[in-house]
Amino acid sequence: MSIGGGVVWANNCTDEYAHMSFDESAGEYLDYTSSRLKEDTSCGYIKGIESSNGYSFNATLVGVDETGYCEDFELIDYDVNPGDEIWMYNYVKENGYNYAAVKCESNTGDDYSVGFLWSPDSV
């Protein structure tokens, strides 16, 4: 009898830094990261690094295709604070999208910026 085991790694789980600035009074309350290849149905990952005023922001993993950002399926929003590590459940790949991005929204009317790490797949 033989027993074996192994580790399965998701394909695109390298963290990439992103920075967003929000200013709701100027209509700048929403932004997206650049798109990245989403190779499997695993969770995405986000880690809050910094916020200029300590406020959180709202993050959602969305699909991306040749027409742009796609939100035509069930989306799951996450509140991200500095120091938070979140495995982002999503339905990007299940809905036929091969690329993903993080949709970021301000959680306050103030002018502030945030920095975070993210990856479209997780280990």
Enumerate the predicted regions with their spans:
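Post-signal peptide N-terminal regions of Sec-secreted extracellular proteins
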Residues: 9-123
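Sec-dependent N-terminal signal peptides of Gram-positive bacterial secreted proteins and lipoproteins
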Residues: 1-10
